[in-house]
C-alpha cells in the first residue's frame, strides 16, 4: 500500500505522524507534495517520507491520494489532475464543505473517501467522521479506518450530510472552545488574577472538567447542577450567561457554521 498527500500542512502532518508512529505504513510508502517546498522538505526530514515537486509523479504509483489543500484551491488542482486517476486508486478528501459529487465531477473519478478530522489530530486526539462511495475498494476502506484510528477516534456515517453537520460541531468545535478559554483567562485577569495564574487555573480547570465528564456516568447537565449551589457564586455567574442567551447563541453559531 502506497499513499500520497497533495498538500503538506498541519492536518497532513498529523495524519503522517499517526501513520508512521503506529506503523500503519512505512515512511517509504508515503509521498508528499506542496506548492511550498519548505513544507515537503520538513516532512521528508522529520518523518523520512518521500517528497515530490510534481503532483502527477507523486500520485503515479499511489493507491490512495489524500487531498489536503484549501477548499478554494480545488478547482486549480482539478485542472491538473482530472482524468489522471486510475480505477484502482482512491481519492481521500479532507476538504470542508466539498461534496463527494463535486469531487467526482472535478476529477472524473468514482472511488472517493471523504473524511473530516479536527485539529486535536496533532496530539492523536482527533474525532474523525467519514464516508465513502459505493465504488471504493474494500481494502482502501479498511486502510482508512486504520489511518484514522492512528490519530484518534473515527466515526463512519452512511449519509454524507452528517459530515457537514459534524464539521460544524466537531471540526470547528476546537475554535469555539479556545474562544471560551480565551474569555475565561481574560475574565480572570480582569478581576485581578496575575496573568500566568489566570492561564494556569483556566487550562487546568478545563482539563479536569473534561476528564470528569469522560469518567463520570452523570450527564453534563447533572455535573453542572452539582457545582451550582442555590444563591451561590456559580449560580450568579450562570444567571448572567442564561440572560445573555448563552446556550441559544451556541446553537445559533453551530447552525451558522452548518
Regions found by a protein language model. Give the residues of each.
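Internal alpha-helical scaffold of NAD(P)-dependent oxidoreductase catalytic cores
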Residues: 106-111, 127-165, 178-214, 256
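Short pre-catalytic strand/loop immediately N-terminal to key active-site residues, enriched for Gly-Thr
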Residues: 112, 163-168, 220-225
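NAD(P)-dependent Rossmann-like dehydrogenase/reductase catalytic/cofactor-binding core
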Residues: 203-258
Amino acid at each position: 500500500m502506497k499513499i500520497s498527500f497533495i498538500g503538506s500542512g498541519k492536518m497532513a502532518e498529523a495524519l503522517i505522524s499517526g501513520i508512521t508512529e503506529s506503523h500503519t505504513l512505512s515512511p517509504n510508502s508515503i509521498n508528499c507534495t506542496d506548492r511550498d517546498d519548505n513544507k515537503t522538505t520538513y516532512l521528508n526530514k522529520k518523518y523520512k517520507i518521500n517528497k515530490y515537486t510534481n503532483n502527477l509523479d507523486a500520485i503515479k504509483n499511489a493507491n490512495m491520494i489524500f487531498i489536503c489543500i484549501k477548499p478554494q484551491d480545488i478547482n486549480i488542482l482539478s485542472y491538473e489532475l482530472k482524468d489522471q486517476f486510475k480505477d484502482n486508486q482512491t481519492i481521500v478528501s479532507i476538504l470542508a464543505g466539498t461534496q463527494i459529487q463535486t469531487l467526482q465531477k472535478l476529477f472524473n473519478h468514482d472511488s472517493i473517501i471523504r473524511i473530516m478530522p479536527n485539529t486535536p489530530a496533532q496530539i492523536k486526539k482527533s474525532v474523525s467522521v467519514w464516508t465513502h462511495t459505493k465504488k471504493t475498494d474494500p481494502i482502501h476502506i479498511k486502510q482508512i479506518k486504520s489511518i484514522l484510528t492512528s490519530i484518534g477516534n473515527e466515526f463512519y456515517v452512511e449519509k454524507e450530510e452528517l459530515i457537514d453537520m459534524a464539521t460544524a460541531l466537531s471540526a470547528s468545535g476546537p475554535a469555539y472552545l479556545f474562544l471560551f478559554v480565551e474569555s475565561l483567562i481574560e475574565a480572570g485577569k480582569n478581576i485581578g488574577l496575575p496573568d500566568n495564574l489566570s492561564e494556569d487555573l483556566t487550562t487546568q480547570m478545563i482539563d479536569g472538567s473534561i476528564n470528569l465528564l469522560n469518567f463520570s456516568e452523570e450527564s453534563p447537565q447533572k455535573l453542572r447542577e452539582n457545582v451550582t449551589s442555590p444563591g451561590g457564586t456559580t449560580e450568579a455567574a450562570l444567571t448572567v450567561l442564561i440572560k445573555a442567551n448563552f446556550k441559544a447563541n451556541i446553537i445559533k453559531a453551530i447552525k451558522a457554521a452548518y
